Amino acid sequence: MRWLLPLFRTVTLAVVRVRRGVCGLGMFYAVRRGRRTGVFLSWSECKAQVDRFPAARFKKFATEDEAWAFVRSSSSPDGSKGQESAHVQKLQVKTSKRPREPLGEEEEPPEPGAKHTRQDTEPAALVSKDAFSYMGESVVVYTDGCCSSNGRKRARAGIGVYWGPGHPLNVGIRLPGRQTNQRAEIHAACKAITQAKAQNISKLVLYTDSMFTINGITNWVQGWKKNGWRTSTGKDVINKEDFMELDELTQGMDIQWMHIPGHSGFVGNEEADRLAREGAKQSEG
């Protein structure tokens, strides 16, 4: 978990937990002294570490930053401000070097004559569970997408998925089909979930710097489906096939979507970005 520590500096973070049919409250259970120390996503996970453990120290927090501060410190920071029922928890964004990403429904214009190409899925050998990094019982993964000359004829897009240092599932590949940044972000998440399913992983903490992807899958997609895959203004959803694929992949998964600022020095995000850029250099298969 050492390589995850830079994450726990004061950063902008939006946390969304989605499980089909269940909306999580996003509370964080910090264990400073117990069978295992760290931050857990449910009381049952926390209880297993502290129940009947001598002089156990643990506390519930509304934010991940506070929880990790409690784990690392010798004295407790201010505790939880109480449960929040909001679907998405947001802390104020301070800086991000990436240009502003459209946050409205489908702001990206379609590329004329472009076709959607579904990614092929390939069988994968099972990887030891010890090779993954965990937050509670959930496996941690970082995804990123990139596109040079976005929206132009010579655009080149790639996707990156980063599971940890030297991990065999780390991948950077060229995005098939229409070459845009938003499609790359969506399909990076698709790739990570596909890999997770192949490893029999059902609980994920998925870090992405794309609020467009997070909003799309946790917010907009349900409304689009009810509206015949049209936006609230009656327009066709530009990335319909991409979100349909992502929506299908999330079925049966317990995914906590976490937003992290892009290009701000966080190792997991920087590595996913590097893999995406390497993927964009590949020829389109």
From Swiss-Prot:
Its main location: cytoplasm. Mg(2+) 1 binds at D144, E185, D209. In the presence of magnesium, manganese is inhibitory. InterPro entries: Ribosomal_bL9/RNase_H1_N, RNase_H, RNase_H1_euk, RNase_H1_N, RNase_H1_N_sf, RNaseH-like_sf, RNaseH_domain, RNaseH_sf. Its EC number is 3.1.26.4. Residues 72-122 are annotated as: Disordered. One of its GO terms (cellular component) is mitochondrion. One of its GO terms (biological process) is mitochondrial DNA replication. Residues 135-281 form the RNase H type-1 domain. Keywords: Cytoplasm, Endonuclease, Hydrolase, Magnesium, Metal-binding, Nuclease. Binds 1 Mg(2+) ion per subunit. May bind a second metal ion at a regulatory site, or after substrate binding. Its cofactor is Mg(2+). Mg(2+) 2 binds at D144, D273. It is found in: Cytoplasm. The keyword Nuclease applies. Monomer. Belongs to the RNase H family. Endonuclease that specifically degrades the RNA of RNA-DNA hybrids. Plays a role in RNA polymerase II (RNAp II) transcription termination by degrading R-loop RNA-DNA hybrid formation at G-rich pause sites located downstream of the poly(A) site and behind the elongating RNAp II. This is Ribonuclease H1. It comes from Rattus norvegicus (Rat). The gene is Rnaseh1.
